[in-house]
């Protein structure tokens, strides 16, 4: 669609061209998310290409927030002396700020895509498809829908196209189209009309190496694009890394990645983005854990989740809110607070039944600023206007009124039920013809019923993802379930799965992998319904005799979990405690479960809880010696020798892991490490049984210098952190 579909476009182009020709200072005022960063880059690169004098400014998320900021403008007007300021992905609500700029005799062009208020800024030109009278009245309803679906970067691209056309250099639009692709995908706008073209063509350009920085960023993230690039790969690799810079620190590395022509500067930007993304992941994990504990301990029955903490970083509270919606399916409002300014800042995420922007608008009389759309929004308020409790009460009242007694329940639209043997590479190839996928064109969701879970592993730096292996008539198939590492599934469970299939290439081998969207398992349903009584004895001392007497006199079946050898040995004097000890292998149904020791990972904890299914849980604080890495190596060496001389080399992974109080991953790593130093040869690997052949004894010092040793110590650190968590975490009693 021609850019002149925007009524103010000719006026905007005339002013921009005048600024370029007269070498006036042009300032692009952007935003700190991926849409804002790519929008900024589109206009900066275009105006530089045309010979313009252009600079950019992106506000600090924490100090300045979204949109034009008066304090920032004072500095910019005095230091950069722009004659023309162009906003991208913001500005439509900045009435007073534009008046302020106008008072200095400077011109402002607003390019934005957010909902427009009744009063719009007195700008030189406004390019926003959602503003009143902004579009040509001759447009059809479908054309209007396409334009109002543009992301901020799509609107900026329209301006760039119009200016390039004026200079007869429209072919340059292909140089900036990759930016439009990234911003459009990241901002979750509907992939209809021109958005679909932007994404389809841009993915092709990026995959073909059109933009060095984006190609290098994909390489850094480990994304193989030999067979092309998908919208999902952009959404889960490029977009989070660009967003991380604006969330955590300065957004400059993200902008430089896109606009720089210096390969060294681009590579440095990628290193910075990767580091910021890791920090962002850690912050999200920690903040969600804190917020979730607070929510659980509150025992709230509210239909909205409203939480605040001055220590939560404003840059990641939106992601945390999204995780709450995924877990609880309730509209969620996560806030941080500044004591210095007496201001609360909130990021909100919604559910499809309730419009989050409408909820916020309903309490706007208590707010200093707000914005948003159907599923996401945000606001600020000072304690002079309202207290946190006032806002919490108002939000819940609004949600209750909108629900009118209805219960919120998540649902998943399924396209087709298949048998597992119908899920193959040809299915994925046929589905790929419908790409690119995104809003208004989701990837198809399929269902396969009655599968058997063969293997389960946790993935990710914080073990937040699940990798499952299910049995098929022709072998097995791998599945991944992002951000659901907490789901208590067990090997052997019968599963009904909803998924999207994709091609996975690993070590040159191509296979089908299922990206799970939901799972039904009978055992899972039973686990969710179990409500146990919890008792916290971790601050108590000298209670072993009392506990021993309790078990002796109780009619209830009691299990005592302990795998640590020192703990087991020290419990021997207490007959009834000692006789009640179980581990991950022999755990059985009991009325009461006592933890004198803690499992090595969440997967083991869930397995024990399902096997024992207790009515009551007792957490004990028992001084355990967490064995050092070298101590375990010596013990493990003895286990290997015993296996090879007495058990014909048949090594049981799970039993060994239980005996040492570690994970199966640790045992497998140890076996590979001992094979590397030629102490053993692994002659056969089954799911849980490795066959070993002893070669000769090896000095411990030789083992300590293997490449696998650092992997082993990292796994042990993770185990120790997990066990320590149970020693210190808050327990809901």
Predicted regions: what they are:
Residues 1-84, 103-105, 122, 140-141, ...:
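Hydrophobic helix-and-loop "lid/oligomerization" segment in the mid-to-C-terminal part
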Residues 88-150:
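Histidine/acidic-residue-rich, glycine-tolerant segments that coordinate divalent metal ions
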Residues 31-32, 59-62, 90-91, 113-116, ...:
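Short, ordered loop/turn segments at secondary-structure junctions
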Residues 594-629:
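Long, low-complexity, charged/polar intrinsically disordered regions in eukaryotic proteins
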Residues 82, 104-107, 612-617:
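A short helix->loop->beta-strand "cap" motif at the edges of active sites that frequently abuts
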Residues 48, 53, 196-291, 349-352, ...:
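Acidic, two-metal ion nucleic-acid-processing modules in DNA metabolism proteins
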Residues 25-27, 83-86, 559, 591-594:
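Structural motif
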Residues 42, 122-169, 173-185, 607, ...:
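Short alpha-helices
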């Amino acid at each position: 669609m021609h850019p002149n579909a925007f009524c103010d476009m000719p006026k905007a182009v005339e002013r921009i061209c005048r600024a370029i020709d007269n070498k006036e200072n042009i300032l692009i005022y952007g935003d700190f998310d991926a849409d804002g960063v790519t929008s900024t880059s589109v206009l900066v690169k275009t105006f530089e290409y045309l010979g313009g004098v252009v600079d950019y400014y992106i506000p600090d998320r924490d100090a300045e927030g979204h949109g034009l900021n008066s304090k920032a403008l004072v500095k910019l007007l005095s230091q950069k002396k722009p004659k023309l300021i162009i906003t991208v992905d913001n500005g439509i609500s900045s009435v007073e700020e534009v008046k302020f700029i106008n008072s200095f005799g400077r011109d402002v062009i607003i390019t934005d895509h957010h909902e427009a208020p009744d009063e719009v800024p007195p700008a030189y030109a406004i390019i926003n498809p959602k503003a009143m009278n902004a579009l040509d009245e001759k447009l059809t309803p479908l054309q209007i829908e396409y334009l109002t679906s543009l992301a901020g970067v799509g609107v900026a691209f329209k301006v760039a196209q119009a200016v390039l056309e004026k200079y007869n250099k429209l072919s340059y639009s292909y140089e900036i189209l990759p930016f439009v692709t990234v911003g459009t995908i990241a901002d979750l706008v509907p992939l209809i009309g021109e958005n679909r073209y932007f994404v389809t063509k841009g993915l092709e350009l990026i995959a073909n190496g059109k933009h060095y920085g984006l190609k290098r960023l994909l390489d850094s993230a480990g994304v193989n694009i030999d067979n092309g690039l998908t919208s999902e790969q952009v959404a889960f690799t490029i977009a989070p890394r660009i967003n991380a810079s604006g969330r955590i620190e300065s957004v400059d590395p993200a902008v430089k990645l896109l606009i720089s022509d210096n390969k060294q500067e681009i590579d440095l930007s990628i290193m910075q983005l990767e580091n910021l993304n890791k920090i962002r992941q850690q912050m999200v994990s920690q903040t969600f854990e804190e917020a979730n504990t607070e929510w659980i301990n509150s025992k709230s029955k509210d239909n909205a989740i409203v939480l605040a903490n001055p220590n939560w970083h404003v840059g990641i509270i939106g992601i945390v809110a999204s995780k709450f919606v995924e877990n609880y399916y309730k509209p969620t409002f996560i806030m941080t607070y500044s004591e210095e300014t007496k201001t609360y800042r909130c990021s909100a995420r919604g559910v499809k039944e309730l419009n989050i922007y409408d909820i916020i608008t309903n309490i706007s009389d208590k707010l200093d600023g707000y914005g948003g759309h159907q599923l996401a929004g945000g606001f600020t308020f000072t304690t002079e206007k309202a207290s946190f409790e006032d806002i919490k009460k108002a939000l819940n009242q609004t949600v209750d009124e909108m629900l009118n007694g209805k219960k919120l329940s998540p649902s998943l639209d399924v396209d087709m039920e298949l048998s597992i043997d119908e899920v193959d590479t040809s299915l994925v190839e046929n589905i790929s013809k419908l790409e690119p996928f995104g809003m208004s064109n989701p990837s198809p969701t399929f269902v396969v019923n009655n599968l058997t879970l063969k293997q389960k592993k946790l993935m990710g730096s914080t073990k937040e993802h699940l990798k499952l292996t299910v049995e098929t008539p022709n072998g097995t198939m791998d599945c991944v379930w992002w951000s659901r590492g907490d789901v208590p599934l067990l090997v052997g469970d019968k599963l009904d799965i909803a998924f999207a299939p994709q091609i996975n290439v690993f070590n040159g081998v191509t296979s089908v992998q299922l990206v799970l969207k939901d799972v039904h398992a009978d055992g899972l349903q039973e686990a969710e319904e179990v409500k146990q009584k919890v008792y916290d004895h971790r601050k108590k001392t000298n209670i072993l005799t009392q506990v021993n007497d309790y078990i002796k006199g109780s009619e209830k079946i009691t299990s005592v979990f302990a795998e640590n050898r020192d703990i087991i040995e020290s419990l021997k004097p207490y007959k009834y405690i000692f006789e009640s000890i179980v581990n991950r292998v022999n755990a059985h149904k009991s009325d009461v479960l006592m933890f004198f020791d803690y499992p090595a990972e969440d997967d083991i904890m869930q397995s024990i809880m399902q096997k024992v299914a207790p009515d009551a849980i007792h957490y004990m604080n028992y001084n355990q010696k967490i064995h050092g890495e070298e101590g375990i190596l010596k013990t493990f060496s003895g286990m290997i020798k015993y296996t090879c001389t007495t058990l014909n080399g048949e090594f049981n992974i799970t039993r060994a892991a239980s005996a040492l109080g570690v994970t199966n991953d640790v045992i497998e790593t140890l076996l590979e490490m001992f094979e590397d130093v030629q102490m053993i040869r692994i002659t056969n690997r089954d799911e849980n049984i490795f066959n070993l052949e002893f070669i000769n004894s090896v000095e411990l010092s030789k083992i300590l210098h293997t490449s696998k040793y650092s992997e082993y110590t990292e796994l042990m650190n993770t185990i120790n952190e997990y066990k320590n968590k149970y020693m210190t975490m808050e327990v809901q009693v």
